């Protein structure tokens, strides 16, 4: 039992900085929304529209690069640190290629916004301007993620946290300068948020690069000392590992976007209540998501050491800690749901609906924690294809259709409105949790030689 407590302490030591880094990232989005809203409601709406298109695209690239963390962790655990720098260099090449693709897609997404039915021309113009300013930050963001994944693969999660808060501190004054046009800069309104955020991503990358080059613990890993061109064999392997993660993230983000679109015709009260419950649930999700990143590092490191038993201890401890956290957040949600809803809105109907939906959110928090930590475990085992198939099946084959039937039709029960979609979330996330755990057990029951062979690829 002692080994599980020791492992839990190590997991939390890795996870807490990741949690704080996620808080900083979320706060940056909050600052953009508030400061754009302070300029005008149209500019705030433009930032919201642009962000809704930016997030799926950039998270696709983010997911692709997550393959680097278990690769670095496994090489570190096996003592083959001399092979880390070449892998990271190829990570930068991959980030560069993906950045170009994302920038092209986002530039052309502007035409989609302009052609939206009944959209205000000024709103469309500002949203397109915001997106086309922000897209220049895509390379900086993805290069930062490569450096961050290198650090996290080496069990150094604090640098990502520090750079996240540096980005937040830089974002506020730079937003102010470009939104309102100070120090000789043009007054850009909401578009200035895009300029500021793009600039901040490059600052975060430069800061992280400076830290990596000066860190004593990484003096033997010098990615910038010699140039190497693209190694397509390594790039292909990273894509094979990362693409299922990227697609899983993309499908998860688009699922919630589709549900938001399906809820929107139900009326202002339903939309507001749904959005409040979803926003709070997203904040709670940061805890298991950060723990999942820590579990990936620990499982990858243990497999690199050649110990499948210790990898199992890391995996089981991660699930146990995740369930404990989820029980705590679920109880907190149930007890404080009305007070939480009042922080967002004081309309009695909105508060009542949001409080009701938060009860459903509390139910799925345990399943959500298990499935996201299960995903982190499978990443550590480099079994990423199953993550995609499980996520797609749970969300799009089970969760969304069942939510649609419950929310908008009378086929099963009288139409439930937004609560039906939340029941669909429960079905989808619970299915994902069960399938993740079954897959984990299947992997762990394989002979050690097969597990270690897969991890060493």
Curated annotation (Swiss-Prot):
Gene Ontology CC terms, in alphabetical order: plasma membrane
Segments passing through the bilayer: 11-31, 53-73, 93-113, 127-147, 160-180, 191-211, 243-263, 276-296, 316-336, 357-377, 387-407, 418-438
Membrane topology value: Multi-pass membrane protein
Key word Transport present: yes
Domain of life the protein comes from: Bacteria
Biological processes, Gene Ontology terms: sodium ion transport; xenobiotic transmembrane transport
Pfam families cross-referenced by the UniProt entry: MatE
GO molecular function: antiporter activity; xenobiotic transmembrane transporter activity
Family matches, as InterPro entries: MATE_fam, MATE_MdtK, MdtK-like, Multidrug-R_MdtK
Keywords, sorted A to Z: Antiport, Cell inner membrane, Cell membrane, Ion transport, Membrane, Sodium, Sodium transport, Transmembrane, Transmembrane helix, Transport
Subcellular location: Cell inner membrane
UniProt function note: Multidrug efflux pump that functions probably as a Na(+)/drug antiporter.
HAMAP family cross-referenced by the UniProt entry: MdtK
Matching PANTHER family: FMN_FAD EXPORTER YEEO-RELATED, MULTIDRUG RESISTANCE PROTEIN NORM-RELATED
Membership in a protein family: Belongs to the multi antimicrobial extrusion (MATE) (TC 2.A.66.1) family. MdtK subfamily.
Protein name: Multidrug resistance protein MdtK
Gene: mdtK
